[in-house]
Every structure is written in C-alpha cells, then in structure tokens.
C-alpha cells in the first residue's frame, strides 16, 4: 500500500514537473513569436507608409504609332511626297511615332496636385506639362495652376488621346502653336458647390511658347505678358439626354520687336502696306472666339462641335520668336472656324467628319495674294475609330486641304495643290 502511494506521488510530481516545463516552454515560444510579430509589424508599418505614398502617385500615358501616306504632288507633277528633313529627297509614306507620353500626377495632400508630362520623340524629349494645381478646399470652386499647361480653349484642352481626328485644326495649330504656355491660371467652377454650370478661366502667360527654338521658349523673350480668358456654360435638356456647352474666349497679347537688321526688316500691316518697326514696338495679337458642343444620346450617341476665332495676329521671322505656321514679318486680320460631327456606330466604332477653315488674311483674296502664307484653306477630314478595348484603339484618318487659288502666289497654288494625307494609327493608353 505504501509502495503504491509512493508510486502515485512520484507520478504526480513528474506530471507537475512536465507541466511546469511545458508551460515555461510555451511561454518562451509565445514570447519569441510575439517579438517576431512585433518585428513584422514594424516592417509592415514601414511598407504601409511606402504604399500610402505610392498611392498618392498616379501614372498614365499613351503611345500613338502610325503609318502615313502623303498624296502630295508638285504643280508640274514631277515630285511626289513631302521633303525629308535635312535632305533633298522626298517621301510619300512613312512609319511614325506621333506621340509617346507618360504623365505623373502626385497628390501629397487633399487639394494639391503636382503634374509632370514629358513627350518622348526619336530625336528628343520635350516637356508638355509641368504645373502645380492648388484646389480651393473651402468653397470647392477655385483652383490655381502655376507652371506649363494647356491654353484654355476647347480644342486644346480636349486630349489628343481622346480626339476623334488625327490632328487639331489648322486654325488652332497656327494661332496657338504647341497648345501650351507658361504662366499662371485661375479657374472657377461653380457647378460643384453651387450647382450652377458655369466655368471661368483666366490665365497670364509668357505668350511665346511654341515660337522660336526650344531654348527661346524656356523663358519670356520680351518681358510683356499675355492675357487669356474663357467662360463656358452648360445646359441639359430632354431628360438629360441632350447636353449643350457654349462659351467664349479671348487672347490679348503682343508680338514685341526684339531686334532689327541692317538694313532694317520691312514688315507688312493688315492692309498689306509696308512699314518698318523699331526695336521695342509691340504688334497686336488679339483674338476673340466662340464655341459650342452638343451631345445627344440618340442611336448610340452623337455629338456636334464647333469653334470660331477672329482677330488680329502678328508674326516675325526672328529666330527667337518665329511661328513656323505664321512665318512672316506681318500683321494680319485672321479668321477661322471648324464644325465636326461624331457618331458612335455600335459599341466599338466611331465615324467622324470635320470641316475647318482658316484665313490668315481676311483683307486679301484671289490673285491679289502674292504670298502663299496669306492663302485661305478649307479642309475636310474624315476619320474612323475602332476601339479594341478600353486601352487600345485603331484610327484611319484622311485629310483633304483645299487652298485658295492665286496666280501670283507661286506655281503650286495656281490650282488646288494636291496635298492630302492618309493616316493609319494604333493608340495604346494606360
């Protein structure tokens, strides 16, 4: 009996010892895991901070690769194609990277955006957008833009990635070269806070971007600033199936004569009369325009868009200021407009047609014109888009420029110069 009790007591002691050892081991294991978890938590906290910062950065962009056919002939029919830059040869077709852009948008805090968008070309990288946008967090109405950004007109602000045609109109490309400028812009959008569909934009700009060499565009060349303003009002009708935006804009600037030659360069005024400006003279560059866009949700959706611009424009051949599409020492009354019609065909196709006109000299016409740069152009553009998915689309576009005829502006322009262009484009965006 005593022996049996001793055995039982020994077993109980052994069990208690095992329990104690097991508990101590378990506690050590738990502590070890707790320390490891604390380390992981610290690492994850660091990763979370990095992820949170990365979430503030949005990266987007697009590539437009295309094949072009230049149905261009000289007046005597001996030359087919367009000049190849830097050579004496001509080409009538080419593969071409039209645009390759990547856009970085950083939002460090609510109401603040930093935007940087370079454009990559085969021979150079250029800066398209670089600005800081400060949004009003109190009234949710105002925003301030500082840097390099789009000039405020409809056709310019409508992205090249979304546009239904291969290129913007001749009017816009001439009057607002490269679309951007450097300066400061204030916007007021009364729709968000006050449910009033009015948007106002006012910008103070250097006024020389897109003119002269890239080095000349980095800063203002004449110290004077240009003013640009735009207003757009939106209405919806027919149970919101019809939307109409209409507005107006103005550009108030000057072309300053920053140098003269010996003998002095002779300019031409709006009446085609010669004059010799002095260094420091400021030549008018004042434009006034109207716009209208109508969207109707009918049979898949259709839209009708148009803009009209009229005013006085000036240019110079000075290398620091020259506008390649207005390359002359002159002041001119100019006028231009376009009308475009876009129709969705099913869910993945869009057909578009555009008629645009640009007259770089409204006071002269026909045989009175002695310089091809004063000829009026009426252009027809036809385009078809196929949307492969949300990121890839195909475009076929055909442009038919029709120039005003003059017997005194060069052999090529005694008749309509044959200079049509066909473009087949693939666009990928992300």
What do these predicted ranges mean?
Residues 1-6:
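Bacterial N-terminal signal peptides
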Residues 8-64, 73:
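N-terminal periplasmic/intermembrane-space "pro-region" immediately following the signal or transit peptide
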Residues 203-218, 268-275:
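Active-site-proximal beta-alpha loop/turn segments in soluble metabolic enzymes
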Residues 218-222, 285:
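Interfacial loop-to-helix transition and helix-capping segments at the boundaries
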